[in-house]
UniProtKB/Swiss-Prot annotation:
It comes from Sus scrofa (Pig). It catalyses: Release of protein hormones and neuropeptides from their precursors, generally by hydrolysis of -Lys-Arg-|- bonds. The active site is at D167 (charge relay system), H208 (charge relay system), S384 (charge relay system). PROSITE patterns: P_HOMO_B (PS51829), SUBTILASE (PS51892), SUBTILASE_ASP (PS00136), SUBTILASE_HIS (PS00137), SUBTILASE_SER (PS00138). Keywords: Cleavage on pair of basic residues, Cytoplasmic vesicle, Disulfide bond, Glycoprotein, Hydrolase, Protease, Secreted, Serine protease, Signal, Zymogen. Its EC number is 3.4.21.94. It comes from the Eukaryota. InterPro entries: Galactose-bd-like_sf (IPR008979), Kexin/furin (IPR034182), P_dom (IPR002884), Peptidase_S8/S53_dom (IPR000209), Peptidase_S8/S53_dom_sf (IPR036852), Peptidase_S8_Asp-AS (IPR023827), Peptidase_S8_His-AS (IPR022398), Peptidase_S8_Ser-AS (IPR023828). The lineage of its organism: Eukaryota, Metazoa, Chordata, Craniata, Vertebrata. Glycans are attached at N375, N514, N524. This is Neuroendocrine convertase 2. Residues 26-109 form a propeptide. One of its GO terms (cellular component) is neuron projection. One of its GO terms (molecular function) is serine-type endopeptidase activity. Coiled coil: none annotated.
């Protein structure tokens, strides 16, 4: 699988984004979904065209004049049988273009323990929900939890907030979910109807979405199963995973579904976590995400929460274009004693963590939640379980302040997540150039619901966001078999221009590189303030020797708040004893952040907090720069 940016950067909804295309050595699979654009006419014309050719139709909300045609009578993997339908559409004089959607794989991120134990619980599971309130149950570490109790005591339970679960459907008849189900905001994109109920299978494989929904919105005090993180929130089902192949049009439609009703979208799926896949959103989905953060929630931006991945130490979530997107909040997981789960992937794009299981045989160490057909379970797990917990915490924050933008939520995540008692046996905790503590696996720490709602209540919207191409290295350079290739790039971060970026949020290194064995590549980038981000770690199962990375946007959040001006360093090398060859053809530095200090006007309640530290840092920097400007002015006059 090959991924990269074409036409390098595309503008949509006032934002720059990388248009990613993918090529595979395998024969493409063609589906019964078509992207159709008409020469003229509106939705009524599209319905007429669709009906004449035997298609159903939906208008795409994120793009003017584009329609989703679907033909339920077509075999999903037969190019020959569907070709004449495509040709008939193309020959219709009203149709400008008709693109048949290719199918690709998307996997649920649920970890299935080989020692699964059947447990039928009739009693409420609240005392077993250690990730909500950890008192040491299931051999856990007391106090290592989401601190939801503090948020609940302050009166925040998710009222007025809707979370969309993009998955295999939800059991909206479940007695622990029914009272919080938002039917108006729900849809089934697998069957094209408004009833996203899971398809029955003997092995309950399609329980994934129902379990995620219960973590967020299971009702409280009804003697059924457990309690959702935001137990007064509404949950919407967006069924989109349960078909033989995923398509760009289904993903884009799901991500852009009802953006004025749905506040938070939770995704516990992504490309295959096999340690050798490089994949991400296609063009329509990228466009839908850009549209979501720019226009969703009345212009405040849809909040996308993504599970970082279940590939373990064999994989790297920077090879997943969903988890490593600037527009998503990528969430990893810890187990109940603070260690990493066996399936956790590490990467520089992860923003924070919540909880799941993964190492322990204790049957109560899993995540307790709702299950299919009115049942309960103690066995939900994987980063699949982590993302909905985060969505629930964000729902509590939104209730505290409905004016929060998608960027505000990311800033709050950075500032209120805590190291707590998290322990990473491989990667140390470090501080970036402005003193923010981060970890390559856990991001900025575990979410703290109490701290987040308290800060959210007084939060002032962060300054406008700008995008700067900080520079580019285009000369091909060979990567030595031993040692490292070191490249440097000095940037002024567009200073003096209208898109100057002074305070960093996200940084992307767009890299084109080939190697005799892609999985042995290691790429690090160091900022001018000395923060080292591991952009790519070794993936021992990735034996690609042909496609490499083609304009792939590696992303880091570790330089959050730093000054981008100065010299950036990129190091590329091989891990392992086998001789290797490689060459880097391009490195483009993309800087995203604000010109004005984001925290100077924020209200500080806790003078030991990261906000207090960051605000002090900003004030000192602003003072230093003001003094420097004054000195230059005085010297200029003399």
């Amino acid at each position: 699988m090959k991924g990269g940016c074409v036409s390098q950067w595309k503008a949509a909804a006032g934002l720059l984004f990388c248009v990613t295309v993918f090529a595979s050595a395998e024969r493409p699979v063609f589906t019964n979904h078509f992207l159709v654009e008409l020469h003229k006419g509106g939705e009524e014309e599209a319905r007429q065209v669709a009906a004449e050719h035997g298609f159903g139709v939906r208008k795409l909300p994120f793009a003017e004049g584009l329609y989703h045609f679907y033909h339920n009578g077509l075999a999903k993997a037969k190019r020959r049988r569907s070709l004449h339908h495509k040709q008939r559409l193309e020959r219709d004089p009203r149709v400008k273009r008709a693109l048949q959607q290719e199918g690709f794989d998307r996997k649920k991120r649920g970890y299935r323990d080989i020692n699964e134990i059947d447990i039928n619980m009739n009693d409420p599971l609240f005392t077993k929900q250690w990730y909500l309130i950890n008192t040491g149950q299931a051999d856990g570490t007391p106090g290592l939890d989401l601190n939801v109790a503090e948020a609940w005591e302050l009166g925040y339970t998710g009222k007025g907030v809707t979370i969309g679960i993009m998955d295999d459907g939800i059991d909206y008849l479940h007695p622990d979910l029914a009272s919080n189900y938002n039917a108006e905001a729900s849809y089934d994109f697998s069957s094209n109807d408004p009833y996203p109920y899971p398809r029955y299978t003997d092995d309950w494989f399609n329980s994934h979405g129902t379990r995620c929904a219960g973590e967020v919105s299971a009702a409280a005090n009804n003697n059924i199963c457990g309690v959702g993180v935001a137990y007064s929130s509404k949950v919407a089902g967006i069924r989109m995973l349960d078909q033989p192949f995923m398509t760009d049009i289904i993903e884009a439609s799901s991500i852009s579904h009802m953006p004025q009703l749905i506040d938070i979208y939770s995704a516990s799926w992504g490309p295959t976590d096999n340690g050798k896949t490089v994949d991400g959103p296609r063009e329509l989905t990228l466009q839908a995400m850009a549209d979501g953060v720019n226009k969703g929630r009345g212009g405040k931006g849809s909040i996308y929460v993504w599970a970082s991945g279940d590939g373990g130490s064999y994989d790297d979530c920077n090879c997943d274009g969903y988890a490593s997107s600037m527009w998503t909040i990528s969430i990893n997981s810890a187990i109940n004693d603070g260690r990493t789960a066996l399936y956790d992937e590490s990467c520089s794009s992860t923003l924070a963590s919540t909880f799941s299981n993964g190492r322990k045989r204790n049957p109560e160490a899993g995540v307790a939640t709702t299950d299919l057909y009115g049942n309960c379970t103690l066995r939900h797990s994987g980063t699949s379980a982590a993302a909905p917990e985060a969505a629930g915490v964000f729902a509590l924050a939104l209730e505290a302040n409905l004016g929060l933008t998608w960027r505000d939520m990311q800033h709050l995540t950075v500032l209120t997540s805590k190291r707590n008692q998290l322990h990473d046996e491989v990667h140390q905790w470090r501080r970036n150039g402005v003193g923010l503590e981060f970890n390559h696996l856990f991001g900025y720490g575990v979410l703290d619901a109490g701290a987040m709602v308290k800060m959210a209540k007084d939060w002032k919207t962060v300054p406008e966001r700008f995008h700067c191409v900080g520079g580019s290295v285009q000369d091909p350079e060979k990567i030595p078999s031993t040692g490292k290739l070191v490249l440097t790039l000095t940037t002024d971060a567009c200073e003096g221009k209208e898109n100057f970026v002074r305070y960093l949020e996200h940084v992307q290194a767009v890299i084109t590189v080939n190697a005799t064995r892609r999985g042995d590549l290691n790429i690090n980038m160091t900022s001018p303030m000395g923060t080292k981000s591991i952009l790519l770690s070794r993936r021992p199962r990735d034996d690609d020797s042909k496609v490499g990375f083609d304009k792939w946007p590696f992303m880091t959040t570790h330089t959050w708040g730093e000054d981008a001006r100065g010299t950036w360093t990129l190091e590329l090398g091989f891990v392992g004893s086998a001789p290797q060859k490689g060459a880097v053809k391009e490195w483009t530095l993309m800087l995203h952040g604000s010109q004005s200090a984001p925290y100077i006007d924020q209200v500080v309640r806790d003078y030991q907090s990261k906000l207090a530290m960051s605000k002090k840092e900003e004030l000192e920097e602003e003072l230093d720069e003001a003094v420097e400007r004054s000195l230059k002015s005085i010297l200029g006059k003399h």
